[in-house]
Amino acid sequence: NCIGEQVPCDENDPRCCSGLVVLKKTLHGIWIKSSYCYKCK
């Protein structure tokens, strides 16, 4: 079971699906506490 794109995940144990990378999400320059899985660009 892997975590899909733009889904919150644990940065220490992300389990993102293949081809995805863990990124910290920003909102108007403010770091949101959770990490998300995103596609590599």
Curated annotation (Swiss-Prot):
Tissue: Expressed by the venom gland.
Subcellular location: Secreted
Source organism superkingdom: Eukaryota
One family name in Pfam for this protein: Toxin_22
Disulfide-bonded cysteines: C2-C16, C9-C37, C17-C40
Main location: secreted
Sorted UniProt keywords: Disulfide bond, Secreted, Toxin
Any one GO molecular function term: toxin activity
InterPro entries according to UniProt: Hwtx-2-like, Toxin_22
GO annotation, cellular component aspect: extracellular region
Protein family membership: Belongs to the neurotoxin 14 (magi-1) family. 01 (HNTX-16) subfamily.
Function of the molecule: Intracerebroventricular injection paralyzes mice. Has no effect on voltage-gated sodium currents.
Protein's name in the database: U3-theraphotoxin-Hs1a
Organism of provenance: Cyriopagopus schmidti
